[in-house]
């Protein structure tokens, strides 16, 4: 019965990968705040100069 130890090795490896990816997701930069016209910059008028403003 060589299957059971192999299964446990795979199971522990998979759980450690899940644990590592969960920790990394916390360190991602938070979502940047969107200003007017869904733009990341505060003054984005020059980028949207051809779009009529409401």
From Swiss-Prot:
- Where in the sequence is the signal peptide annotated? 1-25
Where does it localize? Secreted; Secreted, Extracellular space
Q: Name one GO cellular component term.
A: extracellular space
Q: Which UniProt keywords apply?
A: Angiogenesis, Developmental protein, Differentiation, Gastrulation, Hormone, Secreted, Signal
Q: Which GO terms describe its molecular function?
A: apelin receptor binding; hormone activity
GO biological process, alphabetically ordered? adult heart development; angiogenesis; apelin receptor signaling pathway; coronary vasculature development; embryonic heart tube development; G protein-coupled receptor signaling pathway; mesoderm migration involved in gastrulation; placenta blood vessel development
What the protein does comes down to: Peptide hormone that functions as endogenous ligand for the G-protein-coupled apelin receptor (APLNR/APJ), that plays a role in the regulation of normal cardiovascular function and fluid homeostasis. Functions as a balanced agonist activating both G(i) protein pathway and beta-arrestin pathway of APLNR. Downstream G proteins activation, apelin can inhibit cAMP production and activate key intracellular effectors such as ERKs. On the other hand, APLNR activation induces beta-arrestin recruitment to the membrane leading to desensitization and internalization of the receptor.
Q: What is this protein called?
A: Apelin receptor early endogenous ligand
